[in-house]
């Protein structure tokens, strides 16, 4: 069975690599060779014990040669830079399923009112724009890295316009401790993944100000309605 790739050695990237290792051998890409060596030598990084089925590398060409299914798990601020380095080795045969919560702004303009729709891209749109890859998707859900690394029961949504992307994502990720669901509404999933963070922050602010569950429930329900409005406009 072919290896699966993960790009990014942050907490979520490491946790995802361990989850994938239940079903597959995994290559995880580290930005620096010394990080890859530490993972391979100590089998531990950032407080997480790394599966023996996970091998760390620092070569983009190798990960694209060995893996047709790749999960880029890097911050949105670094996502385009990563794609620029990766794209010489990508082909339309690859599948990229990202786990990045964020939007890419194509302009240097900082005033939100002046932004145009074509200047704001989801990570899937950015992949399509910057690479030759056609089959793209994202994963999103209650995916706290600490709980995943502790092997607590969890789940995620694999979203893509292409059913074979969803199928490949499910086959790679699904296990007795991790449920995987599919959706063809990739843009809706990406937008919700971004906007829910603001609602979560606001809920924490309400609690800090001494407000109770009624206020938080109102915030969450109206926040969800606003997410829907935003999604329709997007």
Spans of features found by a protein language model:
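Electropositive phosphate-/nucleotide-binding environments in soluble metabolic enzymes
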Residues: 10, 14, 33, 57, ...
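Rossmann-like NAD(P)(H) cofactor-binding subdomain of soluble oxidoreductases
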Residues: 57, 62-65, 69-152, 169
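NAD(P)+-binding Rossmann beta1-loop-alpha1 motif at the extreme N-terminus of oxidoreductases
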Residues: 1-50, 54-59, 85, 89, ...
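Short gly/ser/thr-rich secondary-structure transition/capping motifs
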Residues: 50-57, 138-139, 182-184
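Internal alpha-helical scaffold of NAD(P)-dependent oxidoreductase catalytic cores
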Residues: 78, 89, 126-136, 153-234
